[in-house]
From Swiss-Prot:
Name of the molecule in the record: Uncharacterized protein YtzJ
Gene: ytzJ
Phylogenetic lineage: Bacteria, Bacillati, Bacillota, Bacilli, Bacillales
Length: 63
């Protein structure tokens, strides 16, 4: 069984966001890693911070 690192999970979540899907981070550390990935790819997202975690929702030009 392989260990799935937070860094790899952040990269996978950023890839989902690039495809137009939302992403969720349960911890602050994972949310921070996702934000770094988004900055490196210059992706614009809406961040919805809740008591349980953080949702990242891609911003589209359609609205």
């Amino acid at each position: 069984m392989e260990v799935y690192s937070d860094r790899q999970l952040a990269k996978d979540q950023a890839a989902r966001l690039r495809q137009g899907f939302s992403a969720y981070a349960e911890t602050n550390s994972l949310a921070s890693l996702i934000k770094k990935e988004l900055q490196s790819h210059n992706l614009q997202v809406y961040e919805d911070l809740t008591d349980f975690g953080c949702w990242f929702i891609p911003v589209t030009d359609e609205h």
